Amino acid sequence: MNYLSTRGDSTPRKFCDILLEGLAPDGGLYLPEHYPQIDRTTLDHWRHLYAQHGYATLAFEILSLYIDDIPAADLQRICEKTYTPEVFGTLEIVPLKKLGNGFYLEALSNGPTLAFKDMAMQLLGNLFEYELARRGEQLNILGATSGDTGSAAEYAMRGKQGIRVFMLSPHGRMSAFQQAQMFSLQDANIHNIAVEGVFDDCQDIVKAVSNDLAFKRQYKIGTVNSINWARLLAQVVYYFAGYFQATSHAPMLRAGASALPPEGAVPGLGRPGAGRNDEKVDFTVPSGNFGNVCAGHVARQMGL
């Protein structure tokens, strides 16, 4: 699979290159040349894999369609290292909670920082560490946050070899909880920088650095926000997992105790058993910059 810039640069790039680059040299976003098409047989196979082997196996199957420059065995180990009950609190990783007849809540906030962004950031941290070790390189991650992005990124990158994080945040304009999450980290590779101003001032600094290609290349600067295709790709997986659970009609595995349902909800569904792949499911997504919804759009483009 090759990737091209949305601004017209037709130079094909491989996944591991765009993972470390973030933005294309012309300022565009990297997208795959095409979206792999999933037929009914593949959906049936993925449903079975998710039921029998769990979320990490499903993630490997989907990521493999877009990543062909990491050996399959290595990619599978990365997925298995990332999506564990120890990190996300449940066997299902994204357990579904039934709120009413045909109405469910997919729990995406059971990760280390209690934000859905853990789902992709935890994978990014392991992908970065793997690829940087393979190349013998280091990466300086520069980001801007008003809360959950910074926390999720720092908890995913803390202690990772070859990675240093410099996270800008507006001074006095974050929630006390998320500020405590970030500023309490003592890892040597995590650097929090409070900026006098608002979030847009922080973001403007990051954009200015990203647009200075010579500076960016000299100091090996990368990104972890939703402009990085790897983050969006990781989020595609939980749309498939949610679909399989919502359309399951067989007894489920019990959700882990740490994944508490909302008040008034019935017990969790857990991983799916048998089900049908011709049912339609509507996903309603609270969204800020639309990256989360975009991942759902990619899943639908693939045939979900």
Regions found by a protein language model. Name each.
Residues M1-A259, P267, R276-L304:
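PLP-dependent amino-acid enzyme catalytic core
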